[in-house]
């Protein structure tokens, strides 16, 4: 199939679906090969629902079971020259109570309180999504009282 030149960029960026998973007041983050912390998640497969993708990816990368919640954010992330990705983030409700088990895709897993996140080496879009989900969960807890 020939893609018109004007549509070329519309097909050039992969989509990565990420989840903000918070357990006991701490968000799950994974350290990648660039020594950055990132949210668990991964590439959206052709025909895959983004909500199914985030649940699958979090399970594969941490062995955590989650339920996908609301859409939090979407942005284009410039990794390095010639490498861009569209990031879509969802809030996730954690059903696992055990510590995360990191897969071979990452160096290590970490659990961080909201106050620790601003100082971490990670894209600002992830920090924004994490802050949004922490705030929404606090709002849900206050409403439930």
Regions found by a protein language model. Name each.
Residues 1-18:
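Acidic, metal-coordinating catalytic segment for phosphate/diphosphate chemistry
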Residues 37, 104-145:
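Nudix hydrolase/Nudix homology domain
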Residues 64-74:
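A short coil-to-beta-strand element that immediately follows conserved catalytic motifs
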Residues 22-60:
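Conserved Nudix-box catalytic region and its N-terminal flanking loop in Nudix hydrolases
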Residues 76-99, 137:
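Active-site-adjacent beta-strand/loop module that shapes the phosphate/pyrophosphate-binding cleft
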Residues 19, 71, 90-92:
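A structural signal for short, well-ordered beta-strand segments
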């Amino acid at each position: 199939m020939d893609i018109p030149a004007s549509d070329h960029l519309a097909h050039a960026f992969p989509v990565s679906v990420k989840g903000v998973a918070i357990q006991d007041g701490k968000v799950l983050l994974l350290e990648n090969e660039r020594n950055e912390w990132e949210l668990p998640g991964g590439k959206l497969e052709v025909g895959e629902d983004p909500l199914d993708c985030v649940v699958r990816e979090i399970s594969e990368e941490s062995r955590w079971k989650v339920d996908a919640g609301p859409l939090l954010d979407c942005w284009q992330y410039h990794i390095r020259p010639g490498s861009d990705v569209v990031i879509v983030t969802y809030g996730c409700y954690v059903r696992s109570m055990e510590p995360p088990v990191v897969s071979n895709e990452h160096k290590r897993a970490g659990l961080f309180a909201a106050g620790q996140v601003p100082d971490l080496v990670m894209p600002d879009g992830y920090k924004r999504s994490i802050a949004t989900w922490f705030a929404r969960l606090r709002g849900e807890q206050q409403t439930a009282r």
